[in-house]
Structures are given as structure tokens and as C-alpha cells.
Amino acid sequence: MILVSQLRWDDWNRAHIAKHGITPEQVEEVCQGPYIVRQGYKGRLMVIGPDGAGRALVAVLDPEGTDAYYTVSARPASRRERQIYQREKGGGAP
């Protein structure tokens, strides 16, 4: 499993995820909980998992060294992404 121990934040990515109704705290919760990882575009990672309230989110992360990632985007998970998560994690929410 890929370990996401540190997320990098700046004004741009905070404003960008706010457009999707997501907070940095929610992204941090996703990366601390039971998540799955998919390869994304340009070597980025798509992290799918629940926030603290159980809402399924997708965080797009760009690797920046060992276990550190720049948050490119975050948004609510699509129905398909929620199904993939449930299948890999054994059912249940999100």
C-alpha cells in the first residue's frame, strides 16, 4: 500500500478544492483512513476513500519525494468510483 504521510498545500489548491465543496481537512481525513489508490494522469495518484463523515472523495495527488504529495484536486467520488472502493474494501460505506 502507498503511504500518504504528508500533503503539500498552497493558496491555489485550497481554492481549487473549495470549488468542489471540499476542505483540506477532508482530504487529510481521506489520506489517513482506509483508502485505495489508482494511477492517474501524468504519474499522479487518485486516492479514493471516506472523509470523517463517511462521504466518499477522490483526491488527486502529485508525488513530491518519499511519502509527500502535492494536492492537485479533490472532489466527491463518482458512483463508479464508490463501487470500485466498495468492491476492493469488502462492501459497506462509502
Task: Identify the residue ranges that each predicted region occupies.
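Ribonuclease/tRNase effector modules and their secretory precursors
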Residues: 1-94
